[in-house]
Amino acid sequence: MIKELVDNLIKIKQDFAQNYTGNAHIQEILPLKPSKEFPIDTQHLEQLHLFAQKNPIYLNSFEKNILDFPCIVYEGDINEYWLNSIKHGSSCQPFYPTWIMSAYVMSLVAKKIGYSELVDIGSGDGRIAYCGKILDFDSHSIEIDDVLVELQNTICNDT
């Protein structure tokens, strides 16, 4: 299941990257519904969409078939968060989020190999810890940037 999910995720990401014609600073794609190619628990997928819908980073969304897979494209802007994150002398890497599906698959792999706890240090908007929580991990998010902490609080309160 995981290999098929990863293979199909790579395919739609590559096709999307080659054919995207928008101008949003950041884009995210999520399958619209579970399928044979994307065998994701329905409630988990709904939670991933809820994360994107309630995340202030994303300003727009629309349905799009990518390689005949119905998906939702979320478009947004992280400039405010990226610029704020480089103000910290302790910042080694400015905020640039992992794709939600990538965070979910990474957490899924960790669960499959037997982990039950997840700690994400420098967690940005908290998506990795959020995915861990969906999969019943004892999940923790550590972030020092006050603006990103507020972003996480907003998302947590709304999801």
Regions found by a protein language model. Give the residues of each.
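S-adenosyl-L-methionine
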Residues: I2-I113, D145, V149-T159
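Active-site catalytic pocket residues across diverse enzymes, especially alpha/beta-hydrolases
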Residues: A110, L135-D136, C156
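Conserved class I S-adenosyl-L-methionine
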Residues: G114-G124
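Short, catalytically relevant binding-site loops at active-site mouths
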Residues: G124-I128, D146-V149
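Conserved SAM-binding loop of SAM-dependent methyltransferases across substrates and taxa
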Residues: D125-F137
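Conserved SAM-binding motif I beta-strand of class I
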Residues: D138-E143
